[in-house]
Design a protein with these regions (language model features):
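Short beta-strand scaffold segments in enzyme catalytic cores
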Residues: 64-66, 288
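Gram-negative bacterial Sec-dependent N-terminal signal peptides
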Residues: 1-23
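Active-site SXXK
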Residues: 64, 71, 83-107, 229, ...
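Short acidic-glycine loop/turn motifs at beta-strand connectors
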Residues: 68-72, 291-294
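Active-site-adjacent helix/loop patches that line small-molecule binding or acyl-intermediate pockets
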Residues: 24-34, 42-44, 97-216, 232
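Short Gly/Pro-enriched turn/cap motifs at secondary-structure boundaries
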Residues: 54-57, 132-134, 184, 276-280, ...
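Structured C-terminal helix/loop/strand segments within mature extracytoplasmic catalytic/sensor domains
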Residues: 24, 32, 234-334
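Beta-lactamase-like hydrolase cores
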Residues: 23-64
Length: 334
């Protein structure tokens, strides 16, 4: 399966590299504004409420941002409004472990397969004994966090936070209210981490790993931050605005492959079928998507569907990508 994912991602990146974004700035702006106007009044979905602080977030927040691989930034809506990054953080912690320890570390410690279970499933851990998971569901994500190098809890945490900031192009901070709220209610994740420890995938300090994981999910971001992070992946690991090579380009396909197959929880297959875009959602209301070689896009809107994905974000990203030819599999015959 891992070899398949490598080939899958390589095909995406190669196909995307043969095409460029043909639309003018005015056409890109128009695509964003059309999606904003089309979906701003829909009433579907509801905020996540299993984390009390998320239930209180303004459900009317709706911001869209797109960053091209040549560093052009397009935005509309509530672009300054911040939400907690939540599970989108998993993408970038996975990327950090890849950089520090190589691709085999991901496959060997938590796997790269979709589990067929909900993102915080204990059943999946027991069924697969902690293997055959992936870094974008909670068992794999907490394991990935436990693998980040550092001599102390603070050193590990600062390394993760600074890493996220390099993708976003600015220093990021933590929403302390969300962090406390999640910490008070994360007993399930504590249980998951102990199981992963029992099966030998987390090597040491499972509860510390859970605590750091909870803090990484509480990082505040706006739509522009998320689009910049996605665009860095779209640009082969190089931030298109700061110009910094944040991660090795060779590691980007591994990240995109898991995003494509497991990025939107139970609806990952449906999403990929309709858009072709590697993506990742978070229960804070954000979704990022990557059109390799073209752009990164992000939408923030807290109301979620039953799968835990932002309703507006899915619709808006699909429309914008369709308008801009973002699907890497949509290739015309020559």
């Amino acid at each position: 399966m891992y070899a398949f994912k490598k080939i899958f991602a390589a095909v995406v990146v190669t196909a995307a590299a043969t095409v460029t974004l043909a639309q003018t700035p005015a056409e890109i702006d128009s695509a964003l504004k059309a999606a904003m106007d089309k979906y701003k009044d829909i009433k579907e979905g509801a905020n996540a409420d299993y984390i009390p602080a998320l239930a209180k977030v303004d459900s009317k927040i709706y911001g869209i941002a797109l960053v091209t691989v040549d560093g052009k930034i397009y935005t509309t809506g509530d672009i300054k409004s911040e939400v907690s990054i939540q599970s989108i953080s998993k993408v970038f912690t996975m990327a950090k472990v890849l950089e520090e320890q190589g691709p085999a570390s991901i496959e060997n410690n938590m796997g790269v397969d979709a589990t067929g279970q909900v993102f915080n499933s204990i059943v999946a851990v027991e069924q697969y004994k902690g293997a055959e998971m992936n870094p974008l569901v909670n068992p794999g994500a907490i394991t990935a966090t436990s693998m980040v190098k550092g001599a102390s809890r603070d050193e590990i945490w600062n390394s993760i936070l600074n890493w996220y900031g390099e993708f976003a192009g600015r220093k990021l901070g933590v929403n302390q209210e969300v962090f406390k709220s999640e910490s008070d209610t994360n007993q399930r994740n504590q249980a998951i981490s102990m199981l992963m420890f029992a099966y030998g995938h987390i090597k040491d300090k499972p509860l510390q790993a859970t605590d750091i994981y909870t803090e990484q999910c509480s990082v505040n971001v706006n739509a522009k931050d998320l689009a910049m992070m996605a665009a860095t992946l779209a640009n082969g690991g190089k931030n298109p605005v700061t110009g910094k090579q944040v991660m090795k380009s060779d590691n980007v396909p591994d990240v995109l492959a898991v995003m494509a197959t497991a990025g939107l929880y139970d609806d990952s297959g449906k999403w990929l079928y309709h858009t072709g875009l590697p993506a990742k959602s978070g229960v804070g209301g954000g979704i990022i998507a990557v059109s390799p070689g073209k752009f990164g896009i992000a939408v923030i809107s807290p109301p979620l569907d039953k799968a835990g994905n932002s309703v507006r974000a899915q619709k808006a990203i699909a429309d914008i990508s369709n308008a801009l030819g973002g699907n890497p599999y949509s290739v015309k015959a020559h």
